[in-house]
């Protein structure tokens, strides 16, 4: 990268201020001649290189985030990870995709919104307990552990 190269370390509007570790990364990059800026993905930064490390609120607006990835790529901006990979990784169904390809992942079942009979799913899988997660999310938000004997989860709460 040349001295004119600018890399945006992407944050989000919910948490726009960079964390200490992000500031440390920026200082390291700057010491190597890479100019860095911090900007929220919702601001559509127009720099040539994008590294979305702290786009923590994407789960609240997954379609808007997916569109941002697509538009930035179409505009010729470069991501460290391919936008298609990031879009695929946003939704927890990627775990099922990995399992189908032979990767060892925690046993996972994707439950469409219409299917709300959690007891049936647990029974079919032979599970006495399970962890329920939203399809889009991170940091444990909306994650709950359930037991077959006491199912009090409203599956409609998990988009």
Each language-model region and where it sits:
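ATP-binding N-terminal substructure of ATP-dependent carboxylate-amine bond-forming enzymes
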Residues: 1-80, 85, 93, 117
């Amino acid at each position: 990268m040349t001295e004119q190269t600018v890399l945006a370390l992407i944050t989000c509007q919910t948490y726009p201020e960079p964390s200490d570790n992000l500031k440390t990364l920026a200082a390291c990059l700057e010491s190597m001649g890479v100019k860095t800026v911090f900007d929220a993905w919702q601001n559509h930064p127009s720099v040539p290189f994008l590294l979305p490390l702290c786009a923590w609120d994407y789960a609240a607006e997954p379609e808007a985030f997916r569109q941002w990835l697509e538009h930035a790529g179409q505009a010729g901006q470069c991501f460290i990870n391919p936008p298609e990979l990031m879009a695929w990784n946003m939704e927890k169904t990627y775990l099922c995709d990995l399992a189908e390809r032979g990767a060892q992942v925690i046993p996972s079942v994707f439950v469409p919104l219409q299917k709300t009979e959690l007891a049936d799913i647990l029974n079919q899988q032979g599970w006495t307990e399970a962890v329920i997660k939203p399809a889009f999310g991170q940091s444990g938000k909306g994650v709950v552990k359930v037991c077959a004997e006491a199912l009090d989860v409203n599956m409609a709460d998990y988009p």
